[in-house]
């Protein structure tokens, strides 16, 4: 089955395509179907924002659409930046500027648990949807390490591996990331739907 990915983030598209292709899902980008949408993320939860994005692309294309809303939640900041992770610090900052700001805001803070959260929503033309959530716990590093990944990956330390998310190979990341975990939950629901076991 073909689904349109409601994202313009090339690295996110590559990551999701790698995981979804193993399920036999053909992932199309918005560019592939001649659409250029960037719906405003007005939700206050990851679930709401994923739903907004998936439904907008579904309505524009008539094809099933899958969206991910994800972010970093830092315990010491009451879950911030959370749903505002991609906009943390305002529109003038890039990924590096955002994690640098976060590190400045955490200066002197010894309590550094955090988690990446991803919510996947797939909206179908019949009005139904699949919603799945994945989390990956970690610790906010004192400084960046690694050149892989994107977003906050260079400062997201995984104690069990002794590496930041940015130090992992794409294959390693696709085994343990929040997005991989959300997609595993999505896969379970997808298989139920397509094997007729959800009725």
Language-model regions: role of each:
Residues 2-4, 10-199:
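Anionic-ligand binding patches
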